[in-house]
Amino acid sequence: MSYRQTLEFLLYQWLDAEALKERERFSDHTRETFDAVLDTCERIARDKYAPFNRIIDIEEPRFDGEKVILPRATYEAQKAFAASGMLSAAQDYEVGGMQLPYTVEAAANSFFAMASVSIGSGLLTSGNANLLMVHGTPLQKEVFAKNEFSGRFSGTMCLSEPQAGSSLSDIVTRAVPDGDDFEAEPLGPRYRLQGNNTMLSSGDHQPTEKIIHPWPAKQRQTAALERVVVLAALRITLKK
């Protein structure tokens, strides 16, 4: 049994994903649209992702002292992934999404993980943008999240500090108000961050214009609020 056959069995026979089209949000979809998404992702994974496994052995990423140099195949794969619409597949039509059931989106994205997990960082961007869509301001959604969904920007994980791990109450990074007018910033209060963070996947690269880092930090106000954790969105512009 091929991977596609296994995936279709799990999706349609076990999870009964077709039944989701009876819900109002997914009423525009059919088995045919679900299959079309699977077809597209399977093709991109085969043509753009799978060859990367050999290429990366020959053209290893490197740091030239100023920037990270990646194989050209990295750019081509990420461009194809963004063009497919999978970064925003489950989002509302109004923000450029397909209103695809997340079950189908996750199944389709598994083709990329199977083909080359080392290049499959698009899920980090989607997760980053999803966080902003839930907790961000309207302007933050417009400036950050929508540009991530389009592939113009990329995003990283919301990671902790080397000594803290998952114990967020132990982080030591502080968010210090940046000037007396720090709350006047249209995109949200502006802070200076003091501390360290663990940058992991997609932390520095060239394929996108900006990288959005969600950075947890404590906001020093009063002793009673010392344990309050805020989340700052950092925009990093990369030199081409």
Placement of each model-derived feature along the sequence:
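Short, well-ordered loop/turn and helix-capping segments at boundaries between secondary-structure elements
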Residues: 16-17, 114, 133-138, 150, ...
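Internal maturation/activation junctions in enzymes
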Residues: 61, 124-125, 136-189
